[in-house]
A protein has these predicted regions:
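Active-site- or binding-pocket-proximal scaffold segments within functional domains
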Residues: 1-527
Length: 527
């Protein structure tokens, strides 16, 4: 009997070349010299790690190579699996979706017995089985004489960090503005075309009966629609329930799964995962090093900084996500610590008024519920300003599309290449240097020939930035008021009496209570 550990990394994550993700850290922490039990490990780079920058960009955006990655992980398991082996699956981001898809592959088709088979034979059989995965009603006819293990392998543990949609484009219904409607329509069209050319909607990301234990670390604070999380539906309707915990951590997507250079915050989610794993043998001092490196007050990066501002803006709706997945909202105790310390003025925007606090060791804080008559008002204010910021994003998108359309027209109707040295100024020279040739005609007209245009554009852009900053401050102000309600509750204080709990959780409800905190309610604000 041996342990087989399969690891799949996130988009753009390449172990040893990019800052370490939690998946790569765990892969490196496995003791491959262990003989009791024997352990073997497979690591798969994330999509979007090719050497060619254009292929890398397309793969990162559209998930090219995902199907091959799923086959590679399945093939490795098929080649090395013996009955009674323990299988462990780990992934981050799209790699988390990949690992979950591999488990769905096993559930749909079983596991091919690849022992003693040549590379080509096994690859061909896995490709054939993938077709069965896509069309399960025809399983027996398509599999033919491929030898399948009598029973699917039991998955001892599946651990994932912030699973996001692997292929296609997450759709949101609260679209603001013409630009966003056009973008939504375009992405829906591209998604349908991509599914027709490279079918992907057949992948099964659900929990299956062969899984013994499952853990999912999720990001509280990411604001990108493209990184919308795939939360497990915990209502599996199976006679044998899965031991599953899905826990929310402070920070953006890569603050939870790793990949930023300053990794203190992501190490908190890494440590939580390590302390939930049973049966694996790690290298000496792995747990101690993880404890030393974890920093709940570490830096939270801005996931929409720079050109990333063009990611569709949509903070995560924690309550709705958990309700749809038939699970309660579980927040890691490190979030409460960060709130209590007010680190970098941290205040999550869409925490529900009732949630469960959970720690690494199964210890809970026995606290009375805390009442807030102002919670609904503060929450309403946050949602109103979030809606306004979505509208601002729509304006930005429409203005950008307008510039691109005008540039396309001017560039396509130009009689010849522009002699930028004939008539120019310092501003134009800088713009010529930093922008593609595609924009030369537009720059000449708006900066050199009629500079009033660049002056007007500068004023409009400055106003946009100012309004955006005001909206951000307003959203943050309401979030800070919600934070004040939380940190005034006994649950947020480390010296409050604690007690053990079988599931390591305790409920915090801000809707009922013994004595409400005194907090000034803000007046209703209009946009």
């Amino acid at each position: 009997m041996k342990n087989i550990i399969l690891c799949a990394d996130g988009t753009g994550n390449q172990g040893g070349y990019t800052p370490d993700s939690n998946v790569f850290k765990l892969y490196n922490a496995i003791d491959l010299n262990s003989r009791d039990p024997e352990q073997i490990c497979f690591y798969d780079n994330g999509v979007g790690t090719q050497s060619n920058k254009y292929v890398r960009g397309l793969s990162g955006a559209l998930g090219f190579g995902y199907k091959r990655n799923v086959r590679d992980v399945y093939e490795y398991l098929a080649r090395h699996y013996d009955p009674d082996d323990n299988v462990y699956l780990f992934g981050f981001s799209r790699g988390a979706a990949e690992i979950r898809a591999v488990n769905g592959f096993i559930d749909a088709c079983g596991l091919i017995d690849g022992r003693g088979k040549g590379d080509k034979q096994l690859k061909d059989e896995v490709k054939k089985a993938m077709k069965v995965y896509a069309r399960p009603p025809k399983r027996e006819a398509l599999l033919g004489d491929i030898k399948i293990h009598a029973a699917p392998p039991a998955i001892a543990f599946i651990g994932v960090w912030d699973t996001v949609s692997a292929l296609g484009f997450p759709e949101r219904t609260d679209i603001k503005g013409i630009g966003l409607r056009m973008l939504s329509w375009l992405l829906k069209l591209v998604g349908k075309l991509a599914d027709a050319l490279w079918p992907h909607k057949f992948y099964n990301y659900k929990l299956t009966p062969n899984v013994t234990k499952a853990r999912h670390a999720l990001s509280l604070d990411d604001e990108r629609t493209s990184f919308w999380p795939l939360v497990w539906d915990e209502d599996t309707n199976e006679s044998k329930p899965v031991d599953v915990q899905q826990v929310w951590f402070a920070g953006m997507h890569s603050n939870v799964g790793g990949g930023y250079r300053r990794s203190g915050l992501s190490n908190a989610a890494y440590l939580w995962m390590l302390e939930n794993i049973r049966g694996l043998v790690f290298k000496k001092d792995t747990l101690r090093d993880a404890e030393d490196d974890a920093n709940v007050n570490g830096r939270i990066y801005d996931s929409r900084l720079g050109f990333a501002i063009y990611y569709r803006y949509h903070p995560r709706e924690i309550s709705k996500l958990c309700k749809d997945a038939n699970t309660e909202v579980k927040v890691h105790e490190s979030v409460l610590r960060r709130l209590r310390f007010r680190t970098a003025n941290y205040a999550p925007k869409l925490l529900p008024e009732s949630f469960t606090v959970i720690d690494n060791e199964g210890i809970t804080t026995a606290s009375p519920p805390v009442h807030s008559e102002h919670w609904a008002l503060f929450n309403k204010g946050i949602k109103r300003w979030i809606a306004f910021r979505k509208w601002l994003y729509g304006i930005l998108l429409e203005l950008t599309l307008g510039v691109l359309i005008i540039s396309t027209y001017l560039w396509s109707t130009a009689k010849g290449p522009l002699d930028v040295k004939a008539d120019t100024n310092d501003v134009a020279d800088v713009l010529y240097y930093i922008t593609p040739e595609f924009f030369e005609q537009l720059i000449y007209i708006t900066v050199v020939r009629d500079p009033v245009w660049i002056l007007g554009a500068t004023i409009v852009f400055s106003l946009f930035i100012a309004v955006r900053m005001i909206a951000l401050r307003k959203t943050t102000r309401y979030a800070e008021r919600l934070r004040k309600l939380i940190i005034r509750s006994p649950l947020a204080h480390p010296d409050y009496p604690v007690s053990g709990s079988p599931d390591g959780a305790t409920a915090l409800n801000l809707d009922q209570a013994e004595s409400p905190p005194t907090i000034d309610a803000p007046q209703e604000e209009k946009l």
